[in-house]
Amino acid sequence: MNIYDNILKTIQQKGAAYLILLDPDKLVGDNINKFIRVCEDSGVDGFLIGGSLMLDGNFEPFVKKVKGITKLPVIIFPGSINQITSFADAILFISVVSGRNPEHLIGKHVISAPIIKQANLEAIPTAYVLIESGTSTTAQYMSGSLPIPRNKPEIAAATALAAEYLGMKLIYLEAGSGAKETVPNEMVKLVSEYCNVPIIVGGGIKSPNEARQKVINGANIIVTGNFFENENNWDLIKQFADSVHVNIPIKV
């Protein structure tokens, strides 16, 4: 079973999937092993690895180390064409459809496609939709694109639908790392009503209840990352997973 089909199966069985984003610039040393073990024990469904910036060139060794620790899916969430390695299971082949920067719509893809093929990576076509979040985010700056206004759910829905018609297999609604505000629930709901492919929601989700509300409103995959850079929050990972897995009764 490929990774995309595995994601679909998880969504069907659990109601939604919960992925945690690992940033090689932030998670270092022995904390990698410890954090991944906590995630596995807490019911996390897989990992995204990537970041808009890579300050130390440690991407491939980091992915290799993570794969050596866990049997959960490890998916590249690329911030640049340098973040490609055969040690991962798959890569989100991202097009920033909320913007009009040709480099992030098709330019970088032409360069990276042969590299991905050579690495024998499963590429998952993903529409990346940046949503206004109350602050300027690294993703916005690095992609050179404006986010969709958070009070314009109809624009997000039309954008997502167009991406689906173009053949995208995932829609990623992104508020941005460390966002002040999450993607609005009404926007998630409208996009889910328009689209038939899985919807990922990430950015600024800081509580299990927020994660649950995204799923209730139609999100199929929840991504958190920045929130768990603080080890004091690791105890909440299981609560996040339980909140996302709406088809599984919570054990008391």
Regions found by a protein language model. Give the residues of each.
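Glycine-rich phosphate-binding active-site loops on the catalytic face of alpha/beta enzymes
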Residues: 49-54, 90, 94-106, 173-178, ...
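Glycine/Thr-rich beta-alpha phosphate-binding loop at enzyme active sites
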Residues: 142-188, 228-231, 236
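Catalytic cores of alpha/beta
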Residues: 34, 76, 80-94, 194-222
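N-terminal amphipathic alpha-helix/helix-capping segment at the start of soluble metabolic enzymes
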Residues: 1-22, 32, 112-125, 132, ...
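Active-site mouth loops of central-metabolism enzymes
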Residues: 16-32, 78-80, 130-157, 201, ...
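Hydrophobic faces of well-ordered beta-strands that scaffold small-molecule active sites
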Residues: 18-22, 47-49, 74-76, 91-93, ...
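Conserved anion-binding
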Residues: 83-164
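C-terminal helical cap(s) of enzyme catalytic domains, especially alpha/beta-barrels
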Residues: 63-69, 226-252
